[in-house]
Amino acid sequence: MARPMDEDETIVKLQGRSQILYRRDHIKADGRSVSLYGFSSPSGLAGLELVGLGNHRSELRRDPLRNTWAIYSPHRQSRTFMPARTADPLAPWRAGSAPTEIPFSEFELAIFDNQFSSLQTGDAGSVPSQWASGPATGHCEVVVYTSESEGDLQSIGQERRVLLIEALIDR
């Protein structure tokens, strides 16, 4: 069900390095954020959105043989892997389609909080371990630079690459 823009959304006009751009910030039902960027002011209602799995625990562990640190994130085993074209979580939402991470039917560029991040935000607390370990804290986002299901950075054109750089600078 689509819902109108509400208190969970804002549209910000930004002065980019090359031109004016807009950012639409949307808070999803699970608390994660989605930011849409474009050279024109974004419009449209939010549609169905994927809801995150909730809390997860990741930890840093030190490998005593290699003297290196590694991130262990068991919850990532349930992440989406090679979905069917009709269940693409990075596709724009369409009426009658499955929920997606981007609950808007039109966008130029989208950045959202990673549902399957190896890192966790906030105070993760300590994880009991007999080895040297600690919380794996940080923030991970997913960048979707086109609403098309085909293409790459070369095929999107220079204007879209400029928008991508402007959005990354804003982040």
Model-derived segments and their meaning:
Residues A2-R171:
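Active-site microenvironments that recognize anionic phosphate/pyrophosphate groups
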